[in-house]
Amino acid sequence: MIRTLAISLITLFSPFLYSCQKTPEAVTPAPDKEQQEQVEDAGKTLIVYYSFSGDCRSIVASLTANIDAEVLEIQPAEEGLNYAANNYAIGSSLIAAIREKPNDAASYPAIKPVNRNVADYDTVIIVTPLWWSNMAAPMQSYLFQKGSKMAGKTIGLIVSSYSSGISSVVADAKRLIPEGKFVEESLWINNSNRSGKDGLIKNWLSSF
């Protein structure tokens, strides 16, 4: 009788005992090291700029207020040159040399060594002034050296000028970065819209 009672109790409570068992949790495999690095590097952005008057530096400040990016300033190797003197005579001669022989490394003015490897980034935003309708010579020097390493990367271009149109600067960028994936519209900051640059930059960034 005792045995019969024990069997009955087990039969009665077995559903309850089964329901209280802890169900093993599914374990999601951790990504391997390579996958983890790919996730961490996704969307990494580099802002490259050259600024003589300070206008492009101000544009970069607006950019970094809106996005997480690393910044690289391009600097001429020769310090203290006044590019604005004598109606921008120095800048004009530098641009003329590049126009004459755009495929000759000797046509481009020397710049200081850079400390960023562009291959580490997925997106590159170039901020440059306009000189005599073209891209400023120091920025052209940088892109002549590094443009081939930007193949397949998303490229954004912001050009600062007083009033001149930027079509030749866009052409310079595409010549120097022939395999870049350019954002459809480049951003033109000029004397008439400069006071509203923060809003213009924010709207432009939404196109990425």
Predicted segment positions?
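Glycine-rich phosphate/pyrophosphate-binding loop and the adjoining helix
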Residues: 12, 29, 182-208
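N-terminal beta1-alpha1-beta2 submodule of the flavodoxin-like/Rossmannoid cofactor-binding fold
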Residues: 21-123, 135, 199-207
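Hydrophobic helical h-region of N-terminal Sec-dependent signal peptides
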Residues: 6-14
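C-terminal motif of bacterial Sec signal peptides marking the signal peptidase cleavage site
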Residues: 16-19
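Structural alpha-beta junctions
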Residues: 66-72, 177-184
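Solvent-exposed loop/turn segments at secondary-structure junctions
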Residues: 52-55, 76-80, 130-134, 161-165, ...
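Positively charged n-region of N-terminal signal peptides that target proteins for export
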Residues: 1-5
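Helix-loop-strand module that forms the ligand-binding subsite of alpha/beta enzymes
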Residues: 89-178
